[in-house]
C-alpha cells in the first residue's frame, strides 16, 4: 500500500505554535474540525489532542491545493505544510492558545475521509451520553474529554515517579484469583481445564500485597484494575483503577505521611496548587458527632449539635420518646436562613426522608429573639435557653432538628448539611480541603444476618487498647483504619493490618467465620502469617475518583477512556454479549433460561 504521507512528517502538533514561530515552515497533521469559506479563501480548524490551529488555503498561493481543500469535510484526516503567519489585526482569537497565528498552506494531503459524525466533535455539542458512549472514539476527540485523559496520564506518571523515588516497587499481582466474597459480589471466571471450578477477578490486591510484605518486599505499589459486581452510581464502575500501597514496619502515621506527600506532589506538579501538610485529623466519633458523616466536607461550618439531654424531659413527645428509646435528637443551625419559605422547608423535609428521617422539625429565630415554630410551645424557658446557648441561636437563624435512631439522625442531618451549604453558596469550589478520618469501628452489626461484619475488611488490626473488648463488646472496638477525605469525598482508605495468625483467627471467629470456613477461604493467608509476617499497613486510593475531582467533572464516566453505563454495559462493543454454545460446552456450563422470557 502506498505511503499516503509521502515525504511529509509532522514537525509540530496543533497546540504548540505561537507568534514567536512566525516565518517557520511547519507540517501539521490532524482532523478537520471546522471548515469556512470567506471570499474564496478557505479556513480550516485543524485539531489533534494537543489543541487547534487555524490553517488557510488561498487560491492565489496554490490553486490546486485550494481546490483539494474545498472537498474536505468534518473529521477528515489531513496533513498540511505551510508557513506560520501572524494573524492580521482584528483577527486574533484570544480563546485559542494558537489564536495569534495561522498557517498559510502550500501543500495538502488527505490521509483519510470520514463519514458524517453522529454529533459535533466539540465541547459545547449537546448529545446524549448513550450516543457518546456508543461512538466513544469520537467522544474522546473532544477537547474536554481529551484533557481529562491526558490529566489521567499526568497524575499516574507523577504518582509512579514519587513512589519510585521513595523506594516502592511496582509489583503486579494476579488477575485470576480465588473468590473470597466480602461485601460486593465477585466477577467469576470459569476454568476450562478445571471443570466446575471458578476464578474470581480481584476486588482489590489486598491479600497478595500482604503476602508480599510477608515475603520481605517492604514497599509495594500498583496502579491496578479492580472489579466489583455491584449496582452502579455516578462514581462507581464495575471495573475501576486504584493506587494501591503497602508498607512494612510502619504505624498509621507512617502510611498517612507518605500518602500526604504523594497527594501534595500531585497537586503541585500536575495542578500547580500548594497543599498544606500534614492534613487535619478527625476521629470517626468526632466526624459523626460534628458532621453526621464519616466523609465530612470541611470547606464550611454548619456543625451539628446533639440536644438529646435538653429535650428528653420536654413536653414535645416526638423528641422525648426517641431519647427514651435510645435514639438521638440532633440539630443544625443554618445561620441567617430564617428567610427560607415553607416550600423550601417542605422540600428539605422530603430530602431528609430519603435518608430515613420521619420528619424535619424547625425553629426560626425572629428579629426580637422570639421563636417561630410549630414546636416552640412545647419547651420551657429553661429548655429554650439551653438550646439557644448550645446552638448559638441568634435573630435570623433557622434551626433544623432530626429525631431518630443514631444512624438515621446522623445520615439525614449530615446530608442536609451538605445540601444547605450548596444552596447558600458556602462552598468554595476552588478550595481543596483534606482530612484524615481515623479510629473507625472495627465491626458493625448486620441486622439482616444478625452478626457482626467488618466495617472495612477482616484483615484490619484492632486498636491495642480495645483488645479486651473483642469478645465482650465487639461493636465498641476501634480499628487502626484511616480514610483520606477531600471535600466530602473519600479519596482513599487503608489500615494497619493484622500480622499475627492468632489475632487473625480471633477476628475471623468474632465475625462468625468458623475455623473450617476461615481455613477454606483464607487458609493461605493464615499459613503465611505464621512464617514471620512483619507489622505492616497500607492504603488504596480511588484513582478514577481522584481524577474526577481534579478535573471538576461530575461523572466518573467522563474521565475513563472506555467506561461502562449504569447498567454495566459497554455500548461501544455491545458487551456483555451472548457466547457460542460451543464455548459454554467447553466450560461445562449451561444457561438457565428465565421462564418469563
Swiss-Prot record:
Its main location: cytoplasm. It is found in: Cytoplasm. GO terms for cellular component: cytoplasm. The keyword Cytoplasm applies. Belongs to the class-II aminoacyl-tRNA synthetase family. Type 1 subfamily. Aspartyl-tRNA synthetase with relaxed tRNA specificity since it is able to aspartylate not only its cognate tRNA(Asp) but also tRNA(Asn). Reaction proceeds in two steps: L-aspartate is first activated by ATP to form Asp-AMP and then transferred to the acceptor end of tRNA(Asp/Asn). HAMAP family: Asp_tRNA_synth_type1. This is Aspartate--tRNA(Asp/Asn) ligase. It comes from Desulfatibacillum aliphaticivorans.
Amino acid at each position: 500500500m502506498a505511503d499516503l504521507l509521502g515525504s511529509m512528517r509532522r514537525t509540530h502538533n496543533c497546540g504548540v505554535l505561537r507568534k514567536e514561530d512566525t516565518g517557520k515552515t511547519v507540517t501539521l497533521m490532524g482532523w478537520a474540525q471546522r471548515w469556512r469559506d470567506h471570499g474564496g479563501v478557505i479556513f480550516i480548524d485543524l485539531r489533534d489532542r494537543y489543541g487547534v490551529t487555524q490553517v488557510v488555503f488561498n487560491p492565489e498561493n496554490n490553486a490546486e491545493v485550494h481546490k483539494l481543500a474545498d472537498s474536505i469535510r468534518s473529521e477528515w484526516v489531513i496533513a498540511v505544510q505551510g508557513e506560520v503567519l501572524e494573524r492580521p489585526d482584528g483577527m486574533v482569537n484570544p480563546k485559542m492558545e494558537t489564536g495569534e497565528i495561522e498557517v498559510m498552506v502550500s501543500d495538502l494531503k488527505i490521509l483519510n475521509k470520514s463519514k458524517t459524525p453522529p454529533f459535533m466533535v466539540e465541547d459545547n455539542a449537546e448529545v446524549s451520553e448513550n450516543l457518546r458512549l456508543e461512538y466513544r472514539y469520537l467522544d474522546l476527540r473532544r477537547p474536554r474529554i481529551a484533557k481529562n485523559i491526558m490529566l489521567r496520564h499526568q497524575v499516574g506518571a507523577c504518582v509512579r515517579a514519587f513512589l519510585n523515588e521513595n523506594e516502592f516497587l511496582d509489583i503486579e499481582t494476579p488477575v485470576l484469583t480465588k473468590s473470597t466474597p466480602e461485601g460486593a459480589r465477585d466477577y467469576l471466571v470459569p476454568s476450562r481445564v478445571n471443570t466446575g471450578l471458578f476464578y474470581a477477578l480481584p476486588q482489590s490486591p489486598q491479600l497478595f500485597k500482604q503476602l508480599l510484605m510477608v515475603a520481605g518486599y517492604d514497599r509495594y505499589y500498583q496502579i491496578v484494575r479492580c472489579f466489583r459486581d455491584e449496582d452502579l452510581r455516578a462514581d462507581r464502575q464495575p471495573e475501576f483503577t486504584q493506587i494501591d500501597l503497602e508498607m512494612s514496619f510502619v504505624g498509621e502515621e507512617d502510611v498517612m505521611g507518605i500518602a500526604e506527600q504523594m497527594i501534595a506532589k500531585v497537586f503541585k506538579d500536575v495542578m500547580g496548587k500548594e497543599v498544606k501538610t500534614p492534613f487535619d485529623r478527625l476521629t470517626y466519633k468526632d466526624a459523626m458527632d460534628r458532621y453526621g458523616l464519616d466523609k465530612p466536607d470541611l470547606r464550611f461550618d454548619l456543625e451539628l449539635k446533639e440536644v438529646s439531654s435538653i429535650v428528653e424531659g420536654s413536653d414535645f413527645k416526638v423528641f422525648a420518646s426517641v431519647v427514651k428509646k435510645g435514639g438521638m435528637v440532633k440539630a443544625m443551625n443554618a445561620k441567617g436562613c430564617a428567610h427560607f419559605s415553607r416550600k423550601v422547608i417542605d422540600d428539605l423535609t422530603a430530602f431528609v426522608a430519603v435518608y430515613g428521617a420521619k420528619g424535619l422539625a424547625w425553629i426560626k429565630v425572629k428579629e426580637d429573639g422570639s421563636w417561630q415554630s410549630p414546636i416552640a410551645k412545647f419547651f420551657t424557658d429553661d429548655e429554650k435557653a439551653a438550646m439557644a446557648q448550645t446552638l448559638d441561636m441568634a435573630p435570623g437563624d433557622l434551626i433544623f432538628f432530626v429525631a431518630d435512631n443514631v444512624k438515621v439522625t446522623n445520615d439525614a442531618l449530615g446530608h442536609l448539611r451538605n445540601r444547605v451549604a450548596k444552596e447558600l453558596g458556602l462552598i468554595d469550589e476552588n478550595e481543596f480541603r483534606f482530612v484524615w478520618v481515623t479510629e473507625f469501628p472495627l465491626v458493625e452489626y448486620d441486622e439482616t444476618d444478625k452478626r457482626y461484619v467488618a466495617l472495612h475488611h477482616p484483615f484490619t488490626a484492632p486498636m491495642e487498647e480495645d483488645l479486651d473488648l473483642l469478645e465482650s463488646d465487639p461493636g465498641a472496638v476501634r480499628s487502626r483504619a484511616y480514610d483520606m477525605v477531600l471535600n466530602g469525598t473519600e479519596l482513599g482508605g487503608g489500615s494497619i493490618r493484622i500480622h499475627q495468625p492468632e489475632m487473625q483467627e480471633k477476628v475471623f471467629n468474632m465475625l462468625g467465620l468458623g475455623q473450617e470456613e476461615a481455613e477454606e477461604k483464607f487458609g493461605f493467608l493464615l499459613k503465611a502469617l505464621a512464617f514471620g509476617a512483619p507489622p505492616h499497613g497500607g492504603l488504596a486510593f480511588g484513582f478514577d475518583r481522584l481524577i474526577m475531582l481534579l478535573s471538576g467533572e461530575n461523572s466518573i464516566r467522563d474521565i475513563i477512556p472506555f467506561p461502562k453505563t449504569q447498567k454495566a454495559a459497554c455500548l461501544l462493543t455491545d458487551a456483555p454479549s451472548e457466547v457460542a454454545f460451543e464455548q459454554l460446552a467447553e466450560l461445562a456450563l449451561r444457561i438457565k433460561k428465565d421462564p418469563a422470557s
